[in-house]
Amino acid sequence: MAKLCAQQVSVVYASRRGALTALENVSMSVGSGEIVVALGASGCGKSTLLSLLAGFQPPTSGRVSVDGVPVAGPGADRGVVFQDDALMPWLNVIENVAFGLRMQGVGRDARHARARDVLRLVKLAGFEQHRIDEISGGMRQRVGLARALAADPSFLLMDEPLGALDALTREHMQTLLLDVWRATGKGVFLITHSVEEAVLLATELLILSPRPGRIVARHALDFARRYAHGEPVRSIKSDPRFTEIHLALVEQLMRETEEV
C-alpha cells in the first residue's frame, strides 16, 4: 500500500517582523484508500502542508516521503486539484485533461484514450470537444479533477476544491469525489473550511491550530466508508451521530480560535 508521509515537518518564513512559523512539528500520513482531511482556521497552515506533500516547497525541518523515498519536488505520483481550476481556455476539455500526458511525451491517441476514461469517471463523457467557457463552474472543477487523475497518481491532493461552488453543486461534487475514491482506491489529502464536508469525506480528520499550525486533534471517521458500502449520502447526513460529531467539531474549532 502506497503511503505519503510528513514527519515532524516545520515551515518558518522570514518576515520584517522576524521569523514566522507556519507549521510546527506536524506528522501525518495518507495511505491508499484513505481520505485525510485537514480542517482549521484560515492561516493555520493547511495549504502549506499540502504544498509540502505536493513537493512545491521543502520543509524548513522534517521530512516528506512517498514509501520511504524523500520528496524532492512535484511528481506524477501526486495529482493536485486547486480551488481555482487553472484550466487553459485556449484548449478544449479533452486537451486540458490530456495536457500533462502530452508534456510527458505520451502520443495523441494514447493520451486521448486515457482522457476519455477519466472524463467518463467524472461524468463528463460527451463534453470532450467543449471549450472551457462553454461549461459551468462545477463542470470545470470536474475537468480539473480529471486532469489530476489522467496520469494515474497514487495520491490526490486537493486544496479547497469545492470552495467556490454553490451549495447544490458542492453537494453533487462531494458525492462525485466519493464515487471517484471508491472506484480508484487512491489516497486523498483534502483541505476544506466546511465542517460538514470534512465529516462526510474524511476517513481521518486532522484539526490544525491557528498559527503556528500544529495538529491538535485526530478523528477517525467512518461515514465515507459507509457511502462506499452503498449507504446514500442523505441517510448518512440524517444520522444523529453525524450531527453530533459535526456540532462537536464546530465547538472545538471555535475554542481553538478563541484561545489565540
Swiss-Prot record:
Its main location: membrane. GO terms for molecular function: ABC-type taurine transporter transporter activity; ATP binding; ATP hydrolysis activity. Residues 6-235 form the ABC transporter domain. Its EC number is 7.6.2.7. Coiled coil: none annotated. Keywords: ATP-binding, Cell inner membrane, Cell membrane, Membrane, Nucleotide-binding, Translocase, Transport. SMART domains: AAA. The keyword Cell inner membrane applies. InterPro entries: AAA+_ATPase, ABC_transporter-like_ATP-bd, ABC_transporter-like_CS, ABC_transporter_ATP-bind, P-loop_NTPase. The keyword Cell inner membrane applies. GO terms for cellular component: plasma membrane. It is a peripheral membrane protein. It catalyses: taurine(out) + ATP + H2O = taurine(in) + ADP + phosphate + H(+). ATP binds at G40, A41, S42, G43, C44, G45, K46, S47. It is found in: Cell inner membrane. Pfam families: ABC_tran. It comes from the Bacteria. Belongs to the ABC transporter superfamily. Taurine importer (TC 3.A.1.17.1) family. Part of the ABC transporter complex TauABC involved in taurine import. Responsible for energy coupling to the transport system. The complex is composed of two ATP-binding proteins (TauB), two transmembrane proteins (TauC) and a solute-binding protein (TauA). This is Taurine import ATP-binding protein TauB. It comes from Burkholderia pseudomallei (strain K96243). The lineage of its organism: Bacteria, Pseudomonadati, Pseudomonadota, Betaproteobacteria, Burkholderiales. The gene is tauB.
